[in-house]
């Protein structure tokens, strides 16, 4: 039984996304296999997970069990301690090789996120039924501070009144600031409310893939039927729609259909809607019609709170001075903080350090600290701005002048003048040998634009906070 379950989980790991494995498969506990009746009993930790697994994964598990036990097997799901039947001794099956093609076919039937060949509404629903929500991302474990309190308040309002308050809700900000956490929290809150809502979380890249496969299989009717029937659609990183005209067209139709039915749409992006490049103006107009909220890099107190909460979830006591030390030196985003904490915990375990101290942190993070302790340099500004605008650092020095390069270059020159002691000629030299008058023009242009354009002012604020901490 143990050997079978390990094989079952291993096989599902090859076919399902990691978040589905951690959210739905790993919490399951195999109880017993009744060899006489060919019944496999499996326990789920709560009613919500039980119903979800029974609906979405039972046939995969049955297919794997049938291959293993070499006979049709019925899988029953129950809550711990609810069965009046005695525990059945685990039969020791004859280990056999699991037939990969049969299992893969069964798993793909339920896990393939793209539309199948057109058949019926039921066939489309089998493919699309799963929400792909990460149940670990909730409002309860979302750390709130000045940087994200408005976004969290808006998210709570949407979760309580979907389709009526702020539709669409557009969240934007840099990498690792909690946008994905918030939209999963909204979905989980709506599912937990028990209203039977149809929810779908999808990264923009996956949506593009769905459109391509629907086009290849001539399955757009099934595709539209599914997406237009949702109660809540969560689209992550919509900037990846850039230049994908067919995808944008299909999303526009889905957007219009859902909003007309007062169904909720939530979108995340790394930039303000009007700054999205390669996106149809009709979509940008729709994005602006709802509520747009920025999430900024966390301030010091929030970074400390994030570290303390994460350490608590790992079951590791962390003195506040240790959290403060890490937060003081690592400033950019939540993901960086969590990565640093994992590094500290791994270092402490490897070296047998039972208590976390500042000295342990200094040793574990010496490579990161050597970088973060340095003064702000023009080179650091160029890299940070290039990363933000998704261009190459080399574009900062090049003679090319397209708009998608000229603006970031001028922003970097402006920040170099504001945040370093370099003279205009020195800054010009570091930007490919440009004349000091070019730098002065860029500084004046960005300074004037900042006073007039809220979006640019926000971008500069984020970049300054990232660079200064």
Swiss-Prot record:
InterPro entries under this entry?
A: AAA+_ATPase, Chromosome_initiator_DnaA, Chromosome_initiator_DnaA-like, Chromosome_initiator_DnaA_CS, DnaA_C, DnaA_dom, DnaA_N_dom, DnaA_N_sf
Cellular localisation: Cytoplasm
- UniProt keyword list: ATP-binding, Cytoplasm, DNA replication, DNA-binding, Lipid-binding, Nucleotide-binding
Q: Using the UniProt annotation, give all residue ranges assigned to the region (Domain I, interacts with DnaA modulators).
A: 1-71
Residues that, per the record, bind ATP: 176, 178-180
Q: Which CDD domains match?
A: AAA, Bac_DnaA_C
**Any GO BP:** DNA replication initiation
Give the matching PROSITE patterns: DNAA
Residues covered by region (Domain II): 71-131
What are the boundaries of the region Domain IV, binds dsDNA? 349-469
Q: Note whether ATP-binding occurs among the keywords.
A: yes
- Where does the record place the region Domain III, AAA+ region? 132-348
Q: Which PANTHER family match?
A: CHROMOSOMAL REPLICATION INITIATOR PROTEIN DNAA
| Function noted in UniProt | Plays an essential role in the initiation and regulation of chromosomal replication. ATP-DnaA binds to the origin of replication (oriC) to initiate formation of the DNA replication initiation complex once per cell cycle. Binds the DnaA box (a 9 base pair repeat at the origin) and separates the double-stranded (ds)DNA. Forms a right-handed helical filament on oriC DNA; dsDNA binds to the exterior of the filament while single-stranded (ss)DNA is stabiized in the filament's interior.
Free-text comment on this protein's domains from its UniProt entry? Domain I is involved in oligomerization and binding regulators, domain II is flexibile and of varying length in different bacteria, domain III forms the AAA+ region, while domain IV binds dsDNA.
UniProt subunit comment: Oligomerizes as a right-handed, spiral filament on DNA at oriC.
The entry's protein name is Chromosomal replication initiator protein DnaA
């Amino acid at each position: 039984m143990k050997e079978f379950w390990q094989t079952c989980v291993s096989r599902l790991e090859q076919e399902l996304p990691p978040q589905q494995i951690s959210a739905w498969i790993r919490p399951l506990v195999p109880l017993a296999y009744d060899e006489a009746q060919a019944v496999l009993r499996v326990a789920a930790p709560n009613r919500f997970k039980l119903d979800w697994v029974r609906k979405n994964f039972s046939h995969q598990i049955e297919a794997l069990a049938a291959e293993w036990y070499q006979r049709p097997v019925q899988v029953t799901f129950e809550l711990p301690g609810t069965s009046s039947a005695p525990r059945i001794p685990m039969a020791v099956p004859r280990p056999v090789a699991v037939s990969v093609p049969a299992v893969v076919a069964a798993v793909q039937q339920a896990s393939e996120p793209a539309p199948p060949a057109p058949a019926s509404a039921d066939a489309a629903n089998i493919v699309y039924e799963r929400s792909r929500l990460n149940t670990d991302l909730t409002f309860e474990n979302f750390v709130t501070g000045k940087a994200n309190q408005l976004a969290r308040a808006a998210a709570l309002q949407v979760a309580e009144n979907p389709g009526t308050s702020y539709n669409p809700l557009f969240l934007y900000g840099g990498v690792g600031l909690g946008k994905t956490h918030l939209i999963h929290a909204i979905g989980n809150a709506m599912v937990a409310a028990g209203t039977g809502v149809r929810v779908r979380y999808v990264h923009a890249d996956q949506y593009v893939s769905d459109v391509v496969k629907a086009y290849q299989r001539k399955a757009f009717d099934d595709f539209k039927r599914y997406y237009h029937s949702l109660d809540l659609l969560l689209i992550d990183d919509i900037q990846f729609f850039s230049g994908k005209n067919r995808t944008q067209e299909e999303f526009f139709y889905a957007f219009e259909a859902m909003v007309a039915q007062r169904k909720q749409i939530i979108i995340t992006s790394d930039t303000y809607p009007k700054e999205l490049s390669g996106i149809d103006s009709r979509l940008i107009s729709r994005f602006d019609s709802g509520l747009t909220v920025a999430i900024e890099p966390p301030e010091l107190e929030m970074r400390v709170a994030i570290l303390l909460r994460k350490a608590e979830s790992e079951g590791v006591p962390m003195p506040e001075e240790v959290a403060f030390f890490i937060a003081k030196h690592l400033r950019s985003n939540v993901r960086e903080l969590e990565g640093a904490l994992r590094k500290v915990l791994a270092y402490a375990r490897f070296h047998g350090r039972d208590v976390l101290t500042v000295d342990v942190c200094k040793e574990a993070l010496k490579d990161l600290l050597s970088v973060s302790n340095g003064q702000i340099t023009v080179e650091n500004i160029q890299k940070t701005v290039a990363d933000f605008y998704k261009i190459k650092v080399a574009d900062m020095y090049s003679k090319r002048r397209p708009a998608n390069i000229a603006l970031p270059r001028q922003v970097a020159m402006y920040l170099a003048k504001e945040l370093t002691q370099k003279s205009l000629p020195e800054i010009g030299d570091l930007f490919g040998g440009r004349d000091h008058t070019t730098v002065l023009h860029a500084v004046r242009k960005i300074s004037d634009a900042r006073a007039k354009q809220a979006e640019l002012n926000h971008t500069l604020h984020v970049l300054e906070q990232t660079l200064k901490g």
